[in-house]
Amino acid sequence: ACNFQILMTSITVAKFGGSALGVEGAMIPKIIDRIRQLQQESKVIAVFSAPLIEYNNKASSMTDVAIHVGRSYAASTPVEIEVLREIYERIASKYVADSRRRQEFLDSLDKFYRQVIISLKQAAENRRFVDVIRSRTLAYSGEVTMSYLMDYVMQGAGIKSSHVLIEKWPIITDDNFEAANFMVQESRQHSDHLIELAEHSDVVSMGGFIGRTVDGLETTYERGGSDRTAADVAILLNDGYDVKIDLEKDSAVLSADPRIVKDDLEFIQYLSYNEAKLAGMFGMKILDPIAIKEIDDNDLDIPIVITDMARPGAVTMIQRKPPDGGNPIKIVTGKKNCSMVRMESAAASHLVASLEFDRQYHDFIKLSPYRVDDTEMTRLLFLDADYVRRHERHIRAYYPKADIVYGRGVVTLIGDEMWRVPKIASTASSTVSEHDINILNLDAQEETSRILIVVEDKGSSVADAVKAIHSTRKKIRGA
């Protein structure tokens, strides 16, 4: 038999977030340089977030500004809306020198801005800034507009680029407008335009965070959703191309949050999907954990690279099964503002099914059960106490006597290989106790690659516990 291998075209799906773009697009020249570097190895699909803007004396995402404007209109206290347009005019005048290209972009901007005005009028009439009114406003004052603009910037820089037309958007979602769910089959049926652009261009520009329903209504993912867009685009292209995802951030992955821990920080070269998903859930801003979940759910193995934009040589590679080695405790992370919910296990299983399948909500952890008399009880640790506050009635509908406790924080040790280290849980817990931090709960299960320590979220207790455990990480390593 003839043994030959078809060489697939390589594509890098590179995501540039708001901080990568900078205030008023100040970092655009660096992004162009970076895209040129990526181009040397492969074609590029560049996924852009909305830029940052100086607003009310602080740097804010255009998404936050648009939400502020929309809510003001809904509350009948309209504010200046030109801000949603003018930033793009300023960026275009600075970075698109060719007058024909600039005019072409400004024509699109006019069209988008009209959509924003119509949506804001509807928000004022309905006294609500929700659903498609919200997602349409965000799309046309944020990611979609920025992706069109970046195409013209790249063309002006001599790059053979194109942009995905919003009318032919490949990311198809359900109609959960503010926290949409990716629909892979429907998206595949709408991906011809994207594939055609990828075939005929070196770089394709596309907006993150935004989806469309089958019948063409704009939707958004939850905040941080541009990571998901990059993952979803990679899923759509994976059959026909050799795809990798490159998330351009202000740092590669470190062993703890550098804002909390200053000493002995270690650069993490490899993470598994599982480790990265856990780290994202438990407070490390690596990437949106749902992005990995979507790749996982589709049973794919697409490499994800986290690149430090300032030092592109510093990368963390995330794979389904990374090579072994290094400290078995990859990351120590902390999360404030958590909530503990206790209820009978039978009721808890129904609540969990409702959250995961009906509401597509996954931001909680089921801890080890315990018994009261003859009844098995379950503890659910919610990683966002505000969600519990908003949905207390829904939770109590499953178990009226549910015990709901707020003011909890969680410190998590993460590593698929931690089970190899003897006494790791007891060392971690005694370290925390030595710092006079009261441990309310410890949950360590070999199969889960995590050790959770629940503490009171009071003052700097979570940060102190992270520092304490991280300082023993080197000692535990070879214990």
Spans of model-derived segments:
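Nucleotide/pyrophosphate-binding catalytic subdomain
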Residues: 2-287, 444-447, 453-457, 477
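A conserved regulatory-domain signal marking ACT and ACT-like small-molecule sensing domains
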Residues: 314-479
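Glycine-rich beta-alpha junction loops
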Residues: 51-52, 251-253, 308-313, 347
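Phosphate/diphosphate-binding loops
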Residues: 274-308
